[in-house]
């Protein structure tokens, strides 16, 4: 029986698909099924296999949405071209509203090593539960949500997750109440110089395993809205702390962290 307030983690591998329940820091295997994805190219047959499994998931789990369900893929999925991976991710999102996270080999190895610290089994889900991200960027309104951003940073620090940006919580006091908040050590030569700082922040998306967007009550500021295109272009995992309420075009995203 699936417990309330738990998350469902699904791992698609080359020949096996496993469903886990995550409650706190504890995971349990609910179901494991043999599905041969290595016999399928990126076309309708593969799409049907994924769709079929997600439909079966709905029979097991009461709620299947981007807040309660996480999808991870390794093995043959890593061998698809970038465009093929993108088309598969789009298909899953359009048909189910879920995000398919195709794990890069280096991140998969990180998960395996993390998992082995707690178990003798080479299982990426064990590693994900231990530490899901190596590096992240946090986005959100420093003007309005500094306390909430600080709370997230504290949680991430306890998990040994490196925060690429913001690198400090210290704000240049003179910038409070202006259109562009400066962090300690930053200077604004003129209003156009804000673009240099914005670009430096967004350039760190490339090195991050995920972008975490702090949006209490669903609010999304104009600055963060501007950054979405860069996040998607870099094929980054996007996680909101709350359901966003003013997206003009929905795109693949998740809600809530597994460890919060």
Region annotations inferred by a language model:
Residues 25-26, 67, 159-163:
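A generic structural motif
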Residues 7, 68-70, 209-210:
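Structural motif
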Residues 125-260:
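Conserved catalytic or regulatory cores that recognize and/or transform ribose-phosphate-containing ligands
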Residues 4-8, 133-136:
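Extreme N-terminal starter segment of soluble prokaryotic enzymes
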Residues 1-5, 97, 101-124:
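Conserved phosphate-binding catalytic cores of ATP/NTP-utilizing and phosphoryl-transfer enzymes
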Residues 61-91:
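Short beta-strand-loop/turn "lid" adjacent to the catalytic site in phosphate-handling enzymes
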Residues 48-61:
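Short, well-ordered amphipathic alpha-helical segments that serve as non-catalytic structural scaffolds
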Residues 7, 12-47:
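Short glycine-rich, Thr/Ser-proximal phosphate-binding strand/loop in the N-terminal lobe
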């Amino acid at each position: 029986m699936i417990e309330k307030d738990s998350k469902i983690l699904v791992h698609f591998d080359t020949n096996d698909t496993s469903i886990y329940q995550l409650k706190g820091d504890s995971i349990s295997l609910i179901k494991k099924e043999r599905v041969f994805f290595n016999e399928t190219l990126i076309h309708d047959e593969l799409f049907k296999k994924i769709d079929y499994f997600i439909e079966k998931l709905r029979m097991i789990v009461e709620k299947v949405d981007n807040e309660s369900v996480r999808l991870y893929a390794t093995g043959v999925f890593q061998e698809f071209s970038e465009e093929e991976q993108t088309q598969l991710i789009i298909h899953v999102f359009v048909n189910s509203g879920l995000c398919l996270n195709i794990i890069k080999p280096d991140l998969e190895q990180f998960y395996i090593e993390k998992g082995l610290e707690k178990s003798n089994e080479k299982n990426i889900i064990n590693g994900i539960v231990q530490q899901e991200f190596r590096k992240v960027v946090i986005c959100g309104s420093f003007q309005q949500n500094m306390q909430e951003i600080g709370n997230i940073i504290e949680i991430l620090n306890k998990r040994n997750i490196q925060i690429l940006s913001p690198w400090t919580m210290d704000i240049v006091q003179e910038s409070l109440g202006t259109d562009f908040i400066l962090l300690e050590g930053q200077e604004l030569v003129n209003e156009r110089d804000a673009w240099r700082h914005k670009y430096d922040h967004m350039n760190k998306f490339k090195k991050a395993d995920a972008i975490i967007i702090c949006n209490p009550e669903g609010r999304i500021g104009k600055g963060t809205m501007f950054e979405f295109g860069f996040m998607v272009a870099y094929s980054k995992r996007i996680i909101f702390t709350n359901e966003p309420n003013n997206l003009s075009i929905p795109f693949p995203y998740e809600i809530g962290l597994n460890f919060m």
